[in-house]
Amino acid sequence: MCKECDHYDLHYAPGAGVSRRHVLDQLAMGGLASLLSGLPRAANAAKTEDETLRIGYLPITDATPLLVAHAKGYFEEEGLKVAKPELIRGWAPLIEGFAAGRFNVVHLLKPTALWLRYGSHVPVKVVAWAHTNGSALVVQGDGGVKSFADLAGKQLAVPFWYSMHNIVLQYALRESGLTPVIKPQHAMLGPKEVNLQILQPPDMPPALAAKKIDGYIVAEPFNALGELNASARVLRFTGDIWKNHPCCVVSILQPLIEKRPAWAQKVVNAIVRAEIYASQNKEEVAQLLSRDGAGYLPAPAKVVTRAVTAYGQEPVYKDVIRHAEWGNGRIDFQPWPYPSATRLIVQQLKDTKIEGDRVFLDKLDPDFVTKDLVDYVLVKKALARYPDWWRDRSVASGDPFSRQEVLAL
């Protein structure tokens, strides 16, 4: 049994007229445009004169800088009025709320931000990375899976098609001679096929414990939760496949940035400061965010601490980490949005199987997206103000603003 897994039900979100299950299904199929047709246009979201910072977030460690900035009062110290961050119980309602203007700052999966801007015409701008690394592929502890090659014929869950999880997983499967497919769960699979399905993060540990799936790839703390409460075992950490990869990014709508550039700069200043604090105080931050601390996350401190700190020093990961020389952590915190990573994400998405309309992907130019998706000005000013950001282990040596992407199984 998966003890405590029920504490992580993210499906229910109060206060909206659209079925959250329907929204999730539509999002997974790429149908955001039709969903938003009855909502306020995203471009109009900036027209309100209310400058209150309204944060929406999922209860995952990817949201750490937004939550630490709130908990430590960094937003207020920038002169901002801020509402208490609102925990949203799934990607679908978070995306919908952001596009409709309910939230003006959120964390999004980097590929989701790309999909929103170019596939659904929501004017998203990435203003900073929220973290690096921070995810893993876990499998049944007694399932006999020792390598990616052993996943042939298995059922794996990903949190969203437009996610780093889906990109990294499918890369690893292809490199292992396997073919990722998207079929009904009970469909026959070829000898080298691995079936993928969308599953909400809180559903993953109980589904694994009940042997409804053979593994899942997701953000923390659901890997740590699986290890501690669902007899799961980490097969690989995503940061050990794509060195210091982005995952969630801090996002603001472009019309709001253009209307209130000083406001947006203050937001990014506070977030950069929070990432520095999180990088230098991981154990304290884990306790702070947990339900045993300030309660931003429903997970207990034991789970969040493992999710943030347990990595190379753990004997159980001796054969899990293949690139110890990379020197990264289980999750790290640095805000600079490396252009090389955006370029590689676009390139990898073109080779990644995704359910729904993906025609826009075939037309995307990686160099154009690298320049257009990200606002580099705000974050660069914030980094100049808080230069300690470069001390995080995931910042490139030499020129901290440039790096070469490393993707290796």
Tell where the protein language model's regions lie, with residue ranges.
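Ligand-binding "clamshell"
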Residues: 51, 115-127, 173-174, 178-180, ...
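Pocket-lining segment of extracytoplasmic ligand-binding domains
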Residues: 110-112, 185, 201-305
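Short, polar/charged alpha-helical segment
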Residues: 54, 59-87, 116-119, 171-175, ...
